[in-house]
Amino acid sequence: MARTKDPAVRSLLLDRAAQLVGARQPVTLRTLVAGTGVSTMAVYTYFGGMDGVWKALRQEGFVRLAAKLAAVKTSTDPVRDLAALGSAYASNAVENPDLYRVMFDAGFALEDPGAADETLHRLVRAVERAKTAGRFRDDVDPLELATQSWTIGHGLASLVATGPLPHQALAHGVPVLTALFTGAGDDPDRCRRSVERGWGRADPAGSAPRDGRDAPR
C-alpha cells in the first residue's frame, strides 16, 4: 500500500530550498535535505527530482502572491484598489525575498502558468472598474496600464526585497503610481488620495473603505 504524502514535508523542503537560494548556497540533493530529518529519496517522492523542486519553488512564490492579492478587499474606489494590489505585491516580495528571487526565473516551467497569469488579471480587472467609474479615459488599455502598474511594483519590490534600498523606499510608489494613473485620465488630487489609501497602508487587506464613507470624491 502506497504511503500518503505529508504536505508538511513538501513545505519543509521548499522552505529549505528558498533559504539556500537566499543565502546564495548551492541547492543540491544533499544540501536540500541537510538538517531537515528527511532523506534524499523524499526529493524524488515529492518532486520527482531537482527540476521538480525548482518548478515547485517558482509556483510557491506565485501561490503566496495570489493569496496576498486575494486578501485585498474590493472597495468603492477602484483606483485605491489598484494601488492596494500593488502594495500587496511589494509586501509579498519583502516578506518572501527568497521565493521572490526564484519566481521570475524562466529557466524552469511553472507547474500552473494560469495561476501566475491570474495575479496580473486581478490588476486588469481593477483598471476595467476604474474605466467604468470614469476615473480613466475610455481609450486606456486595461492590460497595458495593469502591466505598467505591475512594473512599478516589481521594480520597487526588487530594489527593496533583494536589492540595496531600505524598506522606506517603498513610499516612492505613491508619487509614481499617482503620475501613472493621472496620465490615464484621473483627477490629480483625487488620484493622490486614492493611491495613498491603497499603497500607504501597512495591511492592504484591511484598508478597504467601509460603505464608501472614506472613498475620495
Model regions and ranges:
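All-alpha amphipathic helical-bundle segments outside canonical DNA-binding/catalytic cores
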Residues: 80-83, 114-118, 132-148, 168-171
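Helix-turn-helix
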Residues: 12, 20-52, 56
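Short secondary-structure transition hinges
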Residues: 91-132, 158, 167
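Alpha-helical DNA-contacting segments of helix-turn-helix folds
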Residues: 21, 53-61, 103, 119
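C-terminal peripheral helix-coil segments that are non-catalytic and often amphipathic
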Residues: 121, 125-133, 165-217
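Amphipathic alpha-helical linker/stalk segments
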Residues: 59-82, 114-118, 129
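Generic hydrophobic, amphipathic alpha-helix propensity
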Residues: 8-17, 32, 57-61, 65, ...
